[in-house]
Amino acid sequence: MGVIEFLLALAQDMILAAIPAVGFAMVFNVPVRALRWCALLGSIGHGSRMILMTSGLNIEWSTFMASMLVGTIGIQWSRWYLAHPKVFTVAAVIPMFPGISAYTAMISSVKISQLGYSEPLMITLLTNFLTASSIVGALSIGLSIPGLWLYRKRPRV
């Protein structure tokens, strides 16, 4: 993939990630003045995950690093705009949730219950379930670490 193709794919990824970030921000009753920042943070998070995955990291570690970046930026923006960090961060990480892995695991479990046990279905179920669980864990831990680190009262060392 050339540089131009990568930049176009990155721009497309970031624009498409901003749409569900704004949608979920509206569902969570985020103030109107913060909607554009939720969209920007959602696209920054998803774009950084794409860059990390393109550079060779797997999806779990890329999601962890991207959610840490989203948490850090959200804390800084909350200080600037006098809002809680969750106003910006929660809606911004939702586009990174593992919908395809969770859906594939669910479909595999339904097929196992209908057709009976088969090893390929069980491998598909476990692989996708563990991938989805790891991504959700990476999102939650990565989003909480910047708050634990930056709001710490005692010395870090």
UniProtKB/Swiss-Prot annotation:
Membrane spanning residue stretches: 8-28, 50-70, 87-107, 129-149
Domain of life the protein comes from: Bacteria
Database matches in Pfam families: ThrE_2 (PF12821)
Cell compartment(s), UniProt: Cell inner membrane
InterPro entries for this protein: ThrE_2, ThrE_Dicarb/AminoAcid_Exp, YjjB
Its membrane topology: Multi-pass membrane protein
Keywords tagged on the record: Cell inner membrane, Cell membrane, Membrane, Transmembrane, Transmembrane helix, Transport
Single biological process term from Gene Ontology: succinate transport
Function: Involved in succinate export with YjjP. Both proteins are required for export.
Protein name: Probable succinate transporter subunit YjjB
Organism: Shigella flexneri
Taxonomic lineage: Bacteria, Pseudomonadati, Pseudomonadota, Gammaproteobacteria, Enterobacterales
